[in-house]
Design a protein with these regions (language model features):
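Export/targeting segments at the very N-terminus of extracytoplasmic proteins
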Residues: 21-23, 39-109
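Surface-exposed alpha-helical segments enriched in charged/polar residues
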Residues: 6, 87, 164-167
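Acidic, low-complexity intrinsically disordered regions
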Residues: 11, 83, 96, 168-171
């Protein structure tokens, strides 16, 4: 019986030594101050890292799903799909609601939407109707490294470019649906769930 106790003690000591060595190697120093600081808000550092990783992974998977889809000209994203896509691109809070309302006003959420009415100064593509007419298109192709205007039919590319053009949803001055009030009429329809 004494030999069994000694062996168990040796095993426990070995595992404890391994655990301490691993903690030291990976920069986590055990101690009361660390534990208290990490759990000050009710979440451990590890939990926060997992949530951040999960959110980042979720955004990546969302973008891949929408970018790899094939859309018909009349097909539109549902209100929730559009919200999810815009969130994955980076829009948050008020900017997310505004982006959603602009996309609904401009194209009703249709990735394949196109307005080629040059009389009104349009050659506009995708969910945000990014205008590529004349020099504007040349400049935007160069700035956003677009090989072709057709790439703007990809809702992820369209939304990412819009995110950059609006400085994260803070400057919508290039969109007529903001200027004419059409987007603000859509805000009440934003899917809150």
């Amino acid at each position: 019986m004494e030999k069994i106790k000694q062996r168990l003690s040796d095993v426990a000591h070995s595992w404890t030594s391994i655990a301490v060595a691993l903690l030291f190697l990976f920069g986590v120093q055990p101690g009361p101050d660390t534990s208290l600081a990490l759990e000050a808000n009710g979440e451990s550092h590890r939990e926060k890292m997992l949530v951040a990783k999960d959110e980042k992974q979720l955004k990546k998977e969302t973008l891949e799903r929408y970018s790899n889809a094939v859309y018909k000209p009349s097909e539109m994203l549902t209100d929730k799909e559009l919200k999810e896509l815009l969130w994955a691109v980076g829009f948050e809070g008020k900017a997310l609601k505004t982006a959603w309302a602009v996309a609904k006003s401009e194209s009703n959420g249709r990735p394949m939407a196109y307005n080629g009415n040059r009389k009104t100064g349009d050659s506009s593509y995708g969910i945000f109707q990014i205008n590529m007419l004349g020099n504007l298109g040349i400049d935007r192709k160069e700035k956003f490294e677009l090989r072709s205007n057709v790439l703007l039919f990809d809702p992820v590319i369209n939304a990412e470019i819009t995110y950059h053009m609006t400085q994260g949803g803070n400057d919508w001055s290039s969109w007529s649906s903001i200027k004419n009030g059409a987007a603000s009429k859509r805000l009440d329809d934003f899917p809150n769930k």
